């Protein structure tokens, strides 16, 4: 049968197939490296380089198996024996319908299934060409069932693996020993699955015919050798790297503390102890010397230590006060009157606030007379003023106001303090402390220690803490860093083997029909066509892949190296097994199922359920939408173009 008159259809098919492969790379490739980019173990550029290598390799070695299902398993091609040109037009229509919808979805950042697209598009053109009789419905039912089985199976496997990792590694006080012991097992499992997949599916391509037991033995042997290599070389290197990083962090922290301790307290009048203050604990910095108790008596502490509350918090700072004749009440330097006459504060020398404030006082001394609104610029001086209080208007012993003026005096002091707090600057704050110091030297201020407060309640467990997402420690991050890269490459390899058929399956059918002049397509899938599809997928990844990577790697749920490893390994294992038995499962479904399962286990609130709902709806919308586009193109070809060719 002369097929030269349909050469234009083959050329058009090659162009559309590349566009389809481009759309597959722009959308579905996020399933492979989206979690790796989201967890930060690889950059987007590194992900594109690795994916280009493994997507192409997987498409060549594993793509032929699934390509046969796409070409022959969805429709009965024997019904087109007498109308070969109709089947060729149908393959072109299927590619157009699938490509258009995937490009639209990629633009909208919707992660959809390329398998859904091509299956729906194939059914769409068949319904237009010969009606429902051309569709093998039982095969379609199996495919639809796999769409639900794959996310559930992948999610279950990811969940179980993550629970085990969390139980034996992440929850340990020191996760490094168990993590290093598990590394050879993790690497061996990943390598074994990968080698078995290549040998089982790719052996015919390489001209090898091996029994199942031989393939299993080879896979086990390679995995064992790789595990031995990891145990002898990778684990010691990883242990040294983790130890070195921890030691470096400790050294930097120690050096920072030592440099801060060299700053003399005299440079910080804010923390200058007033005359008459009792000796104080090293961990508590008094703003002033004392506070008056309600009875007007002084309380001193033996040994020069402040009372301390449980759980490491100081009960109070010493605080200077001036007596007021208002019914046994006093007001502190911050001008805040309390019923019991006491104001309690806490400032620790080892706190970051104290150290940062010392730096700011030393390096950023403002000019006198130029106060600034520190509250507006979030300076540490303002924060400390809010914590420690501002010295108010102290009164001398001889300047006792009349009883009717007492309340006004307290109110004026409070207003003055608030006004100073609002427009506080370093100079005004320190001047107020200096004024109080002069008053103390002249005997105008009584210096007393604040009596202890009632013991605070022990910290309660916040139920919301259980809902917070877990984060990997630096050691765990290093342990799973390379593992996630390896499993991401493994997932990319599996993705190339499974999803290249979505782009190249119709093109292979079109090429074989043109070459053989028959619809049976007896020849094997040409390797160069699989490579052509892999190149198209990589191009789509580089140009447009980052759009859906954002959705899969960050928007759906936060990813860490440990959770990303479990997601990659379990979902890739599911995809490879499905590819080896010829079942075109959706890598999107497998990855989304794993991401949601692990995210839900890590934290009930970590999953964006609204986004997951949209993705789930898109799974059902994709088939009819792609079928509708394909049916429209098919109707145009068989009724508007082919009759005139």
Swiss-Prot record:
Which residues span the membrane?
Answer: 6-26, 47-67, 87-107, 110-130, 143-163, 191-211, 214-234, 476-496, 524-544, 565-579, 587-602, 615-635
Instruction: Please give, as recorded in its UniProt entry, the membrane topology of this protein.
Output: Multi-pass membrane protein
Outline which residue ranges sit on the Extracellular face.
1-5, 68-86, 131-142, 212-213, 497-523, 580-586, 636-645
Q: Which GO terms describe its molecular function?
A: phosphate transmembrane transporter activity; sodium:phosphate symporter activity
> Where in the cell?
Cell membrane; Apical cell membrane
Q: Name one GO biological process term.
A: phosphate ion transmembrane transport
Positions in the Cytoplasmic compartment: 27-46, 108-109, 164-190, 235-475, 545-564, 603-614
**InterPro entries of this UniProt entry?**
Phos_transporter
What top-level branch of life does the organism fall under? Eukaryota
Q: Which residues carry this modification: Phosphoserine?
A: 253, 256, 259, 268, 316, 379
Q: What family, per the record?
A: Belongs to the inorganic phosphate transporter (PiT) (TC 2.A.20) family.
Described purpose of this protein according to its UniProt entry:
Sodium-phosphate symporter which preferentially transports the monovalent form of phosphate with a stoichiometry of two sodium ions per phosphate ion. Plays a critical role in the determination of bone quality and strength by providing phosphate for bone mineralization. Required to maintain normal cerebrospinal fluid phosphate levels. Mediates phosphate-induced calcification of vascular smooth muscle cells (VCMCs) and can functionally compensate for loss of SLC20A1 in VCMCs.
Official protein name in the record: Sodium-dependent phosphate transporter 2
Q: Which organism is it from?
A: Bos taurus
**Gene behind the chain:** SLC20A2
